[in-house]
Amino acid sequence: DALVGAMVPFEEKLHVLTAPSDIIPLDLITSSDVHRIIEVARRQFDYVVIETPKTLAQWSEAILNDSHVYFALLELDMRCAQNAIRLKRALQAEDLPFEKLRFALNRGPRFTDLNGKSRVKRMAESLGIAIDLQLPDGGRQVTQSADHGQPLAISQPKAPLRREIQKLALSLHEIGQNSAVAA
């Protein structure tokens, strides 16, 4: 009940545990704290989505181990490619479950951008990863939706990014249903 009380509800369908208003050190919480929060959230909700900081903390391992799937967002630039390869090497060196990572390209090329698609393919091959998901650029629509505190599905229901997120959500829901049936 304490966790749900700390969350901000949206139309009683979505509950969000927002980031603290003050900047706090990443080592303020421990891996066991994170694990307990995830367990409580799993008992309360059908799906738990965690947005992690850009830097790895001691408790990042707990999130990776407790997650069913871990999306690593990247963009089509050299810095993101270097960070992806660093992440891959770090996880493999520590024997962490790298196979849980699903790489998602943010601001992916448009449907007709063949040059962009070939760059994505070359990037994936050179990094030795699969880019499982390509999210289109949401542009101002996403910014405006976030500024108004509204989900993209309500403020911009026909946006291409919203449709891709919906496809992803449906596929994750199917995986969840199949896992529940198997158990």
Give residue spans per PLM region.
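Phosphate-binding loop that captures ATP/GTP phosphates
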Residues: 1-16, 121, 133
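Phosphate-binding/switch loop-helix module in NTP-utilizing enzymes
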Residues: 17-60
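Well-ordered beta-strand positions
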Residues: 47, 69-72, 133
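Conserved Switch II/interswitch segment of TRAFAC-class P-loop GTPases
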Residues: 67-86, 112
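G-domain G4 guanine-recognition motif of GTPases
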Residues: 74-76, 101-115, 134-141, 157
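Conserved C-terminal guanine-recognition region of P-loop GTPase G domains, centered on the G4
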Residues: 81-100
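Beta-strand-loop-alpha "switch" segments that mediate conformational coupling across diverse proteins
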Residues: 107, 123-152, 165
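NTP-binding/hydrolysis catalytic cores, primarily Walker-type P-loop NTPases
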Residues: 147-183
